[in-house]
A protein has these predicted regions:
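Short helices/loops that flank or line small-molecule/ion binding pockets
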Residues: 21, 122-131, 144-159
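Extracytoplasmic/secreted cell-surface and envelope-processing proteins
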Residues: 4, 13-16, 116-119, 145-148, ...
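Append "and occasionally in soluble cytosolic enzymes with long acidic Gly/Pro-rich linkers
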Residues: 18-126, 130
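Extracytoplasmic/peripheral linker and loop segments enriched in polar/acidic and small residues
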Residues: 24, 36-39, 70, 136-146, ...
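A bilobed periplasmic-binding-protein/Venus flytrap-type ligand-binding module shared by bacterial periplasmic
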Residues: 1-22, 29, 38-39, 202
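Ligand-binding clamshell of periplasmic/extracellular solute-binding protein-like
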Residues: 2, 159-179
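Beta-sheet entry/capping signal
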Residues: 3, 24, 106-107, 134-136, ...
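Short, flexible loop/turn elements at secondary-structure junctions
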Residues: 8-10, 30, 43, 55, ...
Length: 205
């Protein structure tokens, strides 16, 4: 499985991904059909949550997934991002978003040891640059990712996005683990890793 992990910290310099609506908008910048058909040669299927269409749990969450209407729609993504940034006082100057007179720069950690993830990172970087962000691309393997992404305090903002990859070991009905693993901070796999010395993501109550 392939996914994009975002750093949602609201500490430190202005971070556009601290804004929930902008994180949501990123879903519409990902051309899943392109990834499946071109990068995977048709050997895959689009996913919109951690439960794919072949998961035993998929039918239980399908009605919720369909309400989001996720699809490749960069115009919609740009509108959402523009609205949210302008509300917070950002302005676009010569095609680049600025906040408090500084360009908004994001760091995209892209796995260079996996050609599929490298391509996904390059494509999404172009989409984000088209929106008006300054994208700093940092390439590395899993060892480097353990240090930069999983081993750092999100508040340090050493990364903004990461081309994540993961796998499933079985076909499980009533999966009690995957939901917590992907969406709960107490499982210790969210940004911050539940380390009390780090900034940690918390679900809205």
């Amino acid at each position: 499985y392939y996914s994009i992990l975002l750093n949602p910290t609201d500490e430190g310099p202005f971070n556009p991904f601290s804004i929930r609506e902008i994180r949501y908008a990123v879903n519409f910048l990902v051309d899943r059909d392109l990834i499946v058909n071109e990068l995977l040669g048709g050997f895959g299927t689009s996913m919109f949550s951690n439960y794919g269409s072949f998961s035993a749990e998929y039918l239980r969450v399908l009605d919720v997934i369909e309400t989001f209407q996720f699809r490749y729609n960069p115009s919609f993504a740009e509108k959402v991002i523009t609205d949210e940034l302008e509300i917070r006082g950002a302005e676009k100057i010569d095609g680049v978003w600025n906040y408090e007179n500084e360009p908004i720069e994001i760091t995209f950690f892209i796995r260079s040891d996996d050609p599929v993830r490298k391509a996904i990172g390059e494509i999404l970087s172009s989409e984000l640059e088209e929106i008006g962000f300054v994208v700093k691309k940092e390439f590395g393997d899993l060892n480097k990712a353990y240090v930069v992404v999983y081993g750092s305090n999100p508040a340090e903002q050493k990364w903004s996005l990461y081309t994540e990859g993961w796998g499933s070991s079985g076909f499980t009905r009533y999966d009690s683990v995957a939901l917590a693993q992907m969406y709960s901070p107490w499982f210790s796999s969210m940004p911050g890793n539940n380390n009390p010395s780090n900034w940690n993501y918390e679900n809205d109550k």
